[in-house]
């Protein structure tokens, strides 16, 4: 789906950048991050969201026998995402720890130097990783951004590749993808000249 972070306010970008990590730490639907692996035990299926500069997507994969589980997970990403405050707090703590470690990492220093050279020290779309960036990450903003970017499936294209038979796949698509709520609004990305 077109749009991505190009449609967000600058103040929302830090929250958008780490939103997918929080979702992965939160679980899905009614299942916490500790319950979900138990529910999926013995199955090979996953689905995850991504928000890029110009697009947002939900990708999934599975073995053939677990296609329905993967489609259920895609469906839940649209209609019942899970944002868990504990998952958010874990990510913030990881970022705080990373901030300490990266001070001694020559690769990170080089990356910061390149960012400053290309965009300046205070570019709102290409911020340096520091205390200010971490402070601007908001749990509530993440939920709002997610609803904005994934609240309408009308402009998503679904591509399915694999060895599943069409006769088996069609009723699953009708059950899980065709039932995702949409409104007729289609978006496009915005050129923010970064």
Task: Say what each PLM segment does.
Residues 146-148:
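A generic local secondary-structure boundary/capping motif
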Residues 1-24, 28-80, 92-100, 106-136, ...:
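M16 family metallopeptidases and their MPP-like homologs
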Residues 152, 157-194:
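An aromatic/glycine/proline-enriched structural segment found at the starts
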